[in-house]
């Protein structure tokens, strides 16, 4: 199938290519291509526009285009008719699909015709997928007229847009062809006219080359004219040549961009299937969510928006089709929902204007605008009341809300209000009223609340309207709107991240020990203190108790309302006439009714409090276990709820104020708001914090020592309060409400009411007077290093107690006595150890120096090992003896008494409790083998020591023994179970990993896995078949034995065959499962390979087109370069010099005008950073190329000389080294070899030394022949040969009178041959070797050294010795020469 398709496509491509080549060859060349002025028109490719078509080719092309368009019109009409018939039920879906296929075929033929004419059709590439998505959406529904009316307008709009585009392109083709025909004769006429003008303008000053003419030189003018005539059409061709289009560069950039975009979705592209494509197209045809979808890109053609003719200010009810599709993926039709239906009467008029089409954010602004009338916070009010709200609002608008755009006459959409999550219950007063706009309500999301807010409490200066029904309705819509929850989450995230950032900064400041920075950061982090004045616990009867209980059953949470407004004056003191009733809400607020004013608060801190409140409320209800009453002591719940609280404590701000006991109703237990809040979680608290101008510190009240409920009132304020009630305003400013409730001291135990109705006999003792800390003392900070309280923490047996002391301990004995008094333990002097915990590292260490013991230190007491074991044994033996004694006594009493007692003895109960404790200990410490072993030893010891007297009833003893056995068996079972648990977990992990590997389709299953699984399955099948053949042979043999030979088969044979058949069945099942496992993986791999094949085909096609674009770009570039080269050669031949630059002077007014113009242009500039960076890079590359091109003439010549290999081949460095080695060897032989051999043989040694010592020539007297020979050697550059004649006066020789040398004795000078000798023979000489050696002692110090390398000749020294030279002396001499050479160098 693929081969046939490839052949067909190859034949089609070859035929098209040959046709296009023939058409191209038949076109005439022309040098200018007209570009349409319309912005939508694309540049015409060179292959289609470099030369105009002939008349026959143009007419044929136009007729082909017209025929294609006509066929396309007919098919579109058939498509509309098929849709109509489909809605009537006369045709099915397949008929519509076949018409669609025909339509797409005609569409592709039409686009191909336009492409041959040089018209780009890229704007129509998305039409097939758009039409397909609309048709799929239509055919999904049941055939009906309603379904057709819903989707038929979309089909018609797509078809109309297609036909209009084709009509426009058809007219464009005709105009271009006509224009190219008319341009050809006109260009010919212009060329002829230019030639005539050149001939006629040689003598005039208005010639065509007047810019290169010097009027003062007739000769130069003639040279210029003749030079310009050598390239007559260079300038004209350069002017008529269009700019380089860079087709290949643009195509490559698009390809790279597509590749980068596809990298992110490579996994999805690799997993594409037919079903997934259909599902994607089906989903793409549905309208997206406007809130979540990004703003669409601007399409090259405007969206088709049909408006009603009678009203242009209203949006059309018909859907709008946005055709800005992404070419990389399957396009989709984005339909804008009708806004006319959703606009309510309360919507501003600006939202109904057509300007919404310009901004996609207007759809969001409609919802935001309609909900922001009554809950909007102005910028000024927000900055004064809530300093941190501006930044948070800005961050919210940046992340979630589209920027405010201009809506109808420059009106800007207002900003969103601050975070307000109001969730009101049906019984809440907020159901009928709303809060003012400057009062955001902060509640945990998803929490129910009962709000007791009075209308009179709102600030009159706020200016908010509460009576408007529209504002109430819009506020409720805004509070219930799910679209703003994400914005609230962003505020929470920003607040939490800001707080974490401050905490990290504080830690860094602490590490750097910067005190000022720490204080400033802590000031930002902490909330401002709330004053303790004017706080009250007032009753609230706005919410019924039943409703409160019903809401609390659904969500047992303590909620809070923090209201923000501005105070004008302080509230007066509250009277004590108000009492606390059960079931009411606790509220601290103004008596004037004003709400709390957070002057220095921030939204981040409020969000943090709400989050802490949520965390506290999500914890289990047993958090308040300290405040629960036992069922036996508290009596019935109804009686407890019927009690009324008339008692309380009073807080006074005066230093002399004391808390006294109220004399009324002392016997009545307290069941007030605190008890109700603790025992009845359905009760709620409403807190409104008040900030006065002079804040004061809260008042602390210690817990009264009485065990019964007492109440006291202050003689000054008489305000009822809760015991140990740290002011709720202060507590709420630093912790959630649930934390405030948990910090309230537990209420005393209430005696149960007497059944007979008599008053309780439990006495109520009077509490001591509670000292009250003054505000001034509380406000003053404690000095550093001074402990106001003196106490230690003592720990023994995992119990820690706080012990107060009057003075610091002086020695370890006092500390031991303190432990003995607290824990009632006895010990000897050295039988215990004391450990202390370091407060910084939390590490315990042995207390050796009492200077480490400070107040508030944690000290642990423990016995040493031996004493600990002994104490443990004594403890166990004491327990056993106590059990024996008590059980024996109780058993005797039971025998004496009657047998009517049904309950077991106390000893048996104690034994059962201890056994339960042991069982719990085993269950908790089952992983510790040593602990289990030790406990078993203790139990065996306890059982052995437990001797039962004969007089004791054996019934209980047998029960205990049975329980002991059961416990031992349970212990064994649990140990075995916990031993198997790690193995089971390990196996389970292996199975999970295998399952994940098999289940994950992204696992590296490639062609290798397919081949390996194929081989494995083949091997398994082969083995199964072989085993099957063996079993078949055995069964056939057994069958023949039974039928023919009448042999009785053995049962062992039949059983074995049954086992083998069962084994084969299992193997077959395994093989089947293997096939089922690999089948989906193989299919997935096939899909990937098919996708890879398609992508590779696309790669080849795209790069083939890219190569064609490169060729066309190269031809255009060559044309422009040839024209520029011709002009450059023309100018180089002419002797005209370039005109010097002349600077024009401007007046001050002109300079001012230029400056203003430049400044205006700078203001109007909209720089593109990416384009500027690209331009900078291009300029840098051009500059580098210019620098590389700057090469002088000498460098060019040397480079050419070396590249052409014009140097003579003389052997190079290797040849020079070889020659030097040969010369060195010759010199060594001449100087030393003969001399050393003669000395060893004892021939003429002394005479040679005497004679050579006498032959010391004058420094300035040189024989002529020797000098010539030396100069000849130096001219040839032979350093080594010249050394034969250079001798140096030895410092060891004794100076003697100079003698006149006899020049006649030198008949033939010793001249070394400069040729490259290979033998060691010397030139013929009249003298012997000794004479040669003596002649070598002559020193030529005045020799003119012409070459630098001959300077080393002066370094050679020959010492005249008066003693016999041996081999050791020769070696020492060489060493001396080396040292001397080094020193000279």
From Swiss-Prot:
Keywords: Coiled coil, Cytoplasm, Cytoskeleton, Phosphoprotein. GO terms for cellular component: actin cap; cell division site; cell tip; cytoplasm. The modification Phosphoserine is found at residue 602. Residues 202-214, 350-362 have a biased composition (Low complexity). It is found in: Cytoplasm, Cytoskeleton. The keyword Coiled coil applies. InterPro entries: AIP3-like_C, AIP3_C, Aip3p_Bud6_N, SRCIN1. Residues 1009-1096 form a coiled coil. One of its GO terms (molecular function) is actin binding. The lineage of its organism: Eukaryota, Fungi, Dikarya, Ascomycota, Taphrinomycotina. GO terms for biological process: actin nucleation; establishment of cell polarity. Residues 1-55, 177-234, 251-369, 401-486, 505-708, 752-776, 882-903, 1312-1340 are annotated as: Disordered. Residues 177-186, 258-274, 419-440, 447-472, 528-543, 574-591, 883-903 have a biased composition (Polar residues). The gene is fat1. This is Actin-interacting protein 3 homolog. Involved in the organization and/or function of the actin cytoskeleton. Signal peptide: none annotated. To yeast BUD6.
């Amino acid at each position: 199938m693929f081969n046939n398709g490839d052949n067909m496509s190859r034949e089609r491509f070859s035929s098209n290519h040959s046709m296009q080549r023939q058409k191209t060859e038949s076109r005439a060349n022309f040098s200018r291509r007209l570009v349409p002025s319309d912005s939508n028109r694309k540049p015409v490719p060179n292959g289609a526009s470099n030369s105009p078509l002939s008349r026959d080719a143009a007419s044929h092309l136009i007729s082909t285009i017209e025929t294609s368009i006509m066929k396309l019109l007919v098919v579109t009409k058939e498509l509309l008719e098929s849709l109509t018939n489909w809605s009537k039920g006369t045709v099915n879906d397949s008929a519509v699909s076949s018409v669609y296929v025909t339509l797409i075929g005609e569409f592709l033929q039409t686009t191909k015709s336009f492409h041959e004419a040089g018209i780009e059709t890229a704007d129509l590439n998305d039409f097939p997928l758009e039409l397909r998505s609309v048709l799929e959406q239509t055919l999904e529904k049941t055939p009906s007229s309603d379904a057709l009316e819903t989707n038929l307008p979309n089909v018609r709009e797509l078809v109309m847009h297609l036909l209009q585009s084709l009509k426009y392109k058809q007219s464009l083709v005709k105009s271009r062809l006509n224009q190219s025909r008319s341009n050809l004769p006109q260009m010919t006429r212009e060329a002829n006219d230019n030639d005539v003008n050149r001939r006629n303008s040689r003598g005039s000053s208005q010639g065509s080359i007047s810019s290169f003419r010097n009027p003062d030189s007739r000769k130069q003018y003639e040279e210029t004219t003749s030079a310009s005539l050598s390239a007559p059409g260079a300038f004209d061709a350069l002017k008529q040549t269009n700019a380089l289009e860079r087709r290949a560069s643009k195509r490559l950039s698009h390809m790279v961009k597509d590749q980068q975009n596809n990298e992110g979705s490579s996994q999805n592209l690799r997993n594409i299937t037919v079903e997934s494509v259909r599902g994607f197209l089906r989903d793409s045809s549905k309208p997206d969510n406007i809130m979540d979808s990004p703003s669409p890109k601007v399409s090259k053609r405007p969206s088709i928006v049909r408006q009603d003719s009678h009203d242009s200010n209203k949006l059309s009810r018909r859907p709008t089709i946005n055709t800005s599709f992404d070419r990389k993926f399957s396009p989709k039709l984005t339909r804008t929902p009708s806004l006319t239906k959703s606009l309510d009467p309360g919507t501003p008029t600006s939202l109904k204007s057509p300007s919404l089409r310009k901004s996609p954010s207007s759809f969001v602004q409609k919802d935001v605008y309609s909900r922001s009338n009554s809950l909007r916070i102005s910028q000024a009010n927000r900055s004064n009341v809530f300093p941190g709200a501006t930044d948070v609002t800005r961050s919210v608008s940046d992340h979630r809300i589209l920027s405010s755009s201009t809506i109808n006459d420059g009106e800007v959409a207002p900003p969103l209000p601050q975070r307000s999550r109001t969730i009101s219950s049906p019984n809440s007063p907020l159901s009928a009223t709303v809060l003012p706009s400057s009062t955001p309500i902060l509640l945990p999301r998803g929490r129910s609340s009962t709000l007791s807010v009075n209308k009179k409490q709102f600030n009159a200066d706020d200016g908010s309207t509460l009576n408007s029904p529209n504002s109430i309705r819009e506020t409720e819509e805004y509070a219930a709107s799910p679209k703003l929850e994400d914005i609230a989450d962003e505020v929470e995230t920003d607040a939490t991240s800001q707080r974490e950032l401050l905490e990290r900064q504080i830690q860094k400041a602490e590490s750097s020990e910067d005190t000022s920075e720490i204080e400033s950061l802590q000031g930002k982090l902490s909330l401002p203190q709330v004053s303790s004045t004017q706080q009250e616990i007032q009753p609230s009867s706005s919410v019924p108790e039943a409703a409160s209980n019903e809401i609390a059953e659904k969500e047992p949470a303590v909620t809070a309302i923090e209201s923000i407004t501005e105070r004008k004056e302080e509230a007066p003191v509250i009277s004590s006439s108000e009492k606390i009733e059960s079931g009411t809400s606790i509220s601290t607020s103004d008596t004037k009714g004003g709400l709390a004013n957070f002057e220095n608060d921030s939204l981040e801190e409020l969000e943090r409090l709400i989050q802490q409140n949520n965390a506290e409320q999500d914890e289990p209800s047993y958090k308040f276990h300290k405040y629960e009453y036992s069922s036996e002591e508290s009596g019935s719940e109804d009686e407890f709820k019927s009690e009324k609280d008339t008692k309380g404590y009073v807080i006074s701000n005066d230093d002399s104020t004391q808390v006294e006991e109220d004399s009324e109703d002392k016997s009545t237990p307290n069941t007030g708001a605190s008890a109700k809040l603790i025992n009845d979680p359905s009760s709620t608290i409403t807190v409104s914090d008040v900030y006065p101008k002079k804040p004061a510190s809260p008042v602390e009240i210690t817990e009264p020592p009485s065990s019964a409920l007492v109440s006291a009132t202050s003689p000054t304020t008489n305000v009822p309060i809760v015991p140990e009630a740290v002011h709720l305003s202060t507590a709420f400013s630093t912790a959630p409400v649930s934390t405030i409730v948990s910090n309230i001291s537990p209420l005393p135990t209430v005696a149960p009411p007497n059944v007979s109705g008599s008053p309780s006999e439990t006495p109520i003792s009077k509490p001591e007077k509670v000292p009250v800390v003054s505000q001034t003392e509380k406000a003053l900070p404690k000095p550093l290093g001074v402990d106001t309280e003196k106490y230690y923490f003592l720990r023994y047996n995992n119990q820690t107690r706080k012990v107060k002391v009057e003075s610091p301990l002086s020695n370890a004995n006092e500390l031991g006595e303190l432990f003995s008094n607290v824990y009632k333990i006895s010990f000897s002097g050295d039988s215990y150890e004391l450990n202390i915990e370091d407060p910084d590292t939390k590490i315990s260490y042995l207390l050796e120096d009492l200077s480490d013991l400070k107040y508030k230190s944690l000290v642990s007491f423990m016995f040493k090992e031996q004493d600990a074991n002994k104490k443990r044994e004594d403890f166990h033996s004491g327990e056993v003896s106590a059990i024996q004694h008590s059980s024996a006594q109780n058993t005797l009493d039971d025998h004496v008494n009657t047998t009517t007692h049904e309950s077991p003895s106390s000893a048996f109960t104690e034994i059962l409790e201890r056994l339960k404790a042991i069982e719990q200990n085993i269950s908790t410490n089952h992983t510790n083998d040593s602990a289990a072993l030790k406990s078993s030893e203790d139990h065996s010891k306890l059982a052995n020591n437990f001797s039962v007297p004969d007089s004791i009833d054996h019934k209980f003893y047998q029960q205990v023994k049975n329980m002991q056995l059961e416990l031992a068996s349970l212990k064994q079972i649990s140990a075995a179970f916990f031993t198997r648990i790690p193995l089971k977990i390990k196996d389970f992990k292996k199975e999970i990993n295998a399952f994940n590997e098999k289940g994950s389709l992204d696992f590296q299953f490639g062609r290798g896995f397919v081949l390996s699984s194929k081989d494995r399955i083949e091997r398994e099948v082969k083995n199964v078949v072989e085993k099957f053949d063996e079993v078949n042979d055995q069964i056939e043999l057994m069958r023949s034995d039974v039928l023919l030979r009448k042999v009785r088969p053995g049962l062992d044979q039949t059983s074995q065959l049954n086992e083998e058949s069962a084994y084969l069945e299992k193997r077959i099942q395994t093989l089947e499962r293997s096939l089922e496992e690999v089948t989906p993986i193989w299919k997935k791999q096939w899909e990937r390979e098919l996708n890879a094949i398609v992508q590779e085909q696309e790669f080849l096609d795209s790069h083939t087109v890219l190569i064609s674009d490169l060729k066309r770009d190269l031809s255009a570039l060559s044309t422009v370069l040839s024209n520029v080269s011709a002009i450059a050669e023309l100018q180089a031949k002419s002797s005209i010099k370039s005109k010097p630059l002349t600077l024009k002077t401007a007046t001050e007014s002109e300079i001012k005008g230029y400056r203003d113009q430049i400044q205006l242009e700078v203001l109007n500039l909209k720089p593109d950073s990416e384009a500027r960076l690209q331009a900078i890079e291009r300029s840098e590359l051009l500059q580098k190329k210019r620098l590389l091109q700057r090469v002088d003439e000498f460098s060019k010549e040397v480079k050419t000389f070396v590249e052409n290999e014009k140097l003579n081949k003389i052997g190079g460095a290797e040849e020079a080294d070889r020659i030097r080695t040969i010369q060195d060897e010759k010199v060594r032989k001449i100087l030393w070899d003969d001399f050393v051999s003669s000395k060893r043989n004892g021939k003429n040694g002394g005479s040679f030394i005497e004679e050579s010592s006498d032959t010391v020539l004058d420094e300035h007297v040189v024989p002529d022949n020797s000098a010539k020979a030396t100069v000849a050697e130096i001219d040839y550059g032979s350093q080594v040969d010249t050394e034969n004649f250079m001798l140096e006066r030895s410092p060891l020789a004794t100076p003697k009178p100079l003698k006149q040398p006899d020049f006649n004795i030198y008949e033939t000078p010793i001249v070394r041959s400069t040729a490259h000798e290979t033998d060691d023979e010397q030139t013929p000489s009249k003298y012997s070797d000794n004479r040669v050696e003596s002649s070598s002692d002559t020193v030529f110090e005045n020799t003119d050294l012409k070459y630098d390398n001959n300077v080393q000749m002066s370094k050679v020294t020959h010492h005249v010795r008066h003693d016999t030279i041996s081999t050791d002396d020769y070696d020492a001499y060489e060493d001396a020469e080396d040292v001397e050479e080094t020193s000279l160098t």
